[in-house]
Amino acid sequence: MSSFDKNDERAQLMVPKSINEGKVVKLSQKTLVTKKIERQVVPEEKYIAGLDKIIEKDYFPHLKKMQAQKEYLEAVANKDINKIKELQMKFCSTGSVRTDRSFRTPITTRSTTEAPDVSSFDADTPGPSSASTSSAHDWMQSPMPFANEEGDNEALNRKRKKKKEETLTSYLNKYTSEDNASFEELAKVMREREDARRPWVYKAEEEHNKNLVTRQAIAAEADVQLALKHAVDADDNRPLNVDNWAYKAWNTVLFNPDGAALTPAEIADAARKQQTEINKRGTRFPDSGKLKPSDEAMTRAAVSHALANAGKVDFLGNEVTPANSFKLLETPNPNPDDMDSPLMTWGEIDGTPFRLDAPDVTEHSLPGAAPVFKIPEVPYREKIAQSMNDSIAAKYRDKRKVAMRAAEGAHFSRTPGFGSKRVSDKLAQLSPAAQKLATKKLGLKMLPAHKSPFASPKIMSNWSRPSSSKRSTTPGSAWSRGSTTPGSSWSQGAQTPGTPGIESMIRRKGDNVGPSTSAGAADRANAGDFF
């Protein structure tokens, strides 16, 4: 029997199949696990101070210079001479001390065997010559510049390692504050509490996703699909779950979705964007704007120079023009005591020299700056005149207010009291019902004009009252309730003299109504006055 026949027999035998046979396992994408960055926890004050130092160094290098100028201007305003001297000595370089030439000394202290550096002195300052120095110098006692302490020549190849300056990103990756560290610890504790409170949720998710096997056909690998087909009589032992369905505890139905997975191109783009690049030039003006004046400023300077030299001649009698108009300049002296020059310093801040009492950048010096209108300050004389004018105007306003109050008090008097002529006229014009109401409720006694019971009541007046009346006739008491006190109002039957009553207004029988009436009859009211 050949080997081929044996193989055919073996193929006809039923071999038990495993559970996972016929299943396609889809491997997940490999994930790169990186080491967690451990930051050093520092106090809050130290952390903030380090951030301030790096930000000032990298993004605002001119801040130190501006702070010095601010301190100087405040010292000048407060007339603090000690502070001014301190700032001058602080920002004055060691090579240019503002002292007399005769008192200038070398800055650094040298040994007796070492020759002083001639370059540290000024050109006009006499110093030791090189010949005398070389004759007195002992070369055996001086260290060799080409050898180290042991005498080897290895020192020539050794270079001091330059200290790497720390950037803002490296500082944030290396250090963290106590507040940030405590917050991360609290967040970690909360996550652990959540896992301990609902372990069944996260455990079920982990078990399901670990045993998940996808059985979806892969169209790109058709030959693999044909090789992994199940036999017709084989049992289907597949788990009763949906194909390609991963379980997640925080599902997208009840919670916000995390979003679709990123493609390789998007991952590469995100990694490239994580490399932060800070434009430090955007935090300051360019130096060319401070040093180079604008074209408008140069044009204005040329025009003003030409107008100032118009009609002038030089020592040869030629007219001075802008082309050949040069001035004689004096040799600058760094000592401000000799010349009235502005206080300057030769420092190591930004530029040498710079003025402490004036800004470096002006609005007119910037390129493309437009002309600026500036209102001059009010002169001191104008301020005094304005204050005097305001004080005089305030006095006049006070006098006017006092006069207006006096006029208002005289014009707007009190409400007329009862018993006056105007009130009596109004009461006389009332209806009988109103007069009855005044009699009962207000206590006014209304006397009838005639004996007839149907006659209209009347208010007694001083003119019609008989002389034998026992009621009060005190002047000034009107419509009083039987009171005889002078000045009391609402007296019963008492009226101020001169007040007309109803009796004088009613026409009696037999009165003469013709044109030849008397003076008393002419003052009586007509019937038409009541309608």
From Swiss-Prot:
Compartments, as annotated in UniProt: Nucleus
Record GO cellular component, one term: nucleus
Q: Which residues form the signal peptide?
A: none
- Renumbered to this chain, region (Disordered) spans 104-163, 453-531
Instruction: Show the ranges annotated as biased composition (Polar residues).
Output: 105-114, 480-498
- Coiled-coil regions, chain positions: none
Keyword Nucleus attached: yes
Which Pfam family, any one, appears in the UniProt record? Answer: Es2
Q: Which family does it belong to?
A: Belongs to the ESS2 family.
**Name of this protein:** Splicing factor ESS-2
Organism the protein comes from: Caenorhabditis elegans
